[in-house]
Amino acid sequence: MDSPTLLLFIFASIFYFITFQIVKLGFNVVMTSKKTKRRRLPLPPGPKPLPIIGNVLELGPKPHRSFANLAKVHGPLMSLRLGSVTTIIVSSSDVAKEMFLKNDQPLSSNRTIPNSVTAGDHHLLTMSWLPVSPKWRSFRKITTFHLLSPQRLDSCCSLRQAKVQQLFEYVLECSRTGQTVDIGKAAFTTSLNLLSKLFFSLELAHHRSSKSQEFKDLIWDIMEDIGKPNYADYFPCLKYFDPCGIRRRLANSFEKLIEVFQGIIRQRLSLSSGSDTHNDVLDVLLQLYKQKELSMDEINHLLVDIFDAGTDTTSSTFEWAMAELIKSPKTMEKAQAEIKLVLGKESHIQESDIPKLPYLRAIIKETLRLHPPTVFLLPRKAETDVELYGYTVPKNAQILVNLWALGRDPKVWENPDVFLPERFLTCDIDVKGRDFGLLPFGAGRRICPGMNLAYRMLTLMLATLLQSFDWKLPNELNPRNLDMDEKFGIALQKTKPLEIIPVCKD
């Protein structure tokens, strides 16, 4: 074989060898991909999506109820396509338990950010929306250890007692004049003044002022706008246009609330003497600001989060508790009898008395079961493909835990739609994220840091108003006909405020 022919043969052999290897490699990749696809578990079941819009029409005006009804058909772990967003809905305690115990990190580290909370860069400046990161851990530490630590809560026990005493005096005045009490507004004012006194050493409103209702309306606007469905979240091309105007409204609400905080902060910073300390939370925040651990924007948005969560959700839950008791007079009488048995007629209730009142605490738990402070846990985003309950939660999917449905899981709760505090007298279930049929404050690393403060205030306010007053509806309305309709936001408020008449006990 001559040299040119030999070279041609060698090149041809090399070419065919390389071609064969490429084909073989491609074949192996295809086969491996097919095997992987065969091994990968399917998405959770769900209703068939429509072209382009997916399952958006399934949401309805009350998505928590819509999702709970769909879960009865498709199962406790369900997938929907909301526009272009794959959304996984958790609707049972079994699924929630597996999610938090086995997959808390990949399913809780990131958030799906609603377009609305990008207003004013809120999502970058607050712990609620940040991914788990050094910055998030720093915020969590500041909140847990500096602002809402058990030591600080214990030290402000007398402050809570004083605010509840103001509530009592307002209700007593109403009882003497035969006036109705707007229970939600009264509880909101109490919660607002507790936080403002704890944080700023001043009160932002009082029970007879219009300021209280203005704050309540402003906070609800924020809660409603963050919670409501938004087309900009489902169709990325719309996020720049804000078609529903939600982001613009939320930016305006943030500005109004921050303006209040900034007025207080400017006044505090203007104090010339370094010895003028108030020993309150604002002093702590400003010290962290001076040490460059927090920026002023971060302080502003941290306060927005805390005052949102600490006023509206607490007052809404309290209003639901009183509404359930009005509808169930025998339950109210039983709670009042327990208080009388433990404390007698003369002694005013103290926070230290609450552990002696198991039925009262059962009423609070039952209210939190039926009316959780937030309807859904804030939306999470899967970091990677995750196996959950025999299905695949795909990377970047949005995960919504339907707390309203968990509290009505028939596998956990007998007669789940019935208000029955007695169920908690025979079981050791708490609200601290360990029992997955009752997660009113969440679970895992993102559990609500204000849980203990909210629970203490709810029990103390309820005990005080039940100890000193009987309650009735105006115009001799039958309690069974009480309107229990709800309006949707991050929390659920009564559509029609609960206005009832206090009758002072002899």
UniProtKB/Swiss-Prot annotation:
Protein name, UniProt field: Cytochrome P450 monooxygenase 76AD94
Glycosylation sites (chain numbering): 110
Family matches, as PROSITE patterns: CYTOCHROME_P450
Gene: CYP76AD94
Membrane topology, from the record: Single-pass membrane protein
Binding site for heme: 448
Organism: Lophophora williamsii (Peyote)
PANTHER family found in the cross-reference section: CYTOCHROME P450 76AD1-LIKE (PTHR47950:SF12), CYTOCHROME P450, FAMILY 76, SUBFAMILY C, POLYPEPTIDE 5-RELATED (PTHR47950)
This protein's UniProt keywords: Alkaloid metabolism, Glycoprotein, Heme, Iron, Membrane, Metal-binding, Monooxygenase, Oxidoreductase, Transmembrane, Transmembrane helix
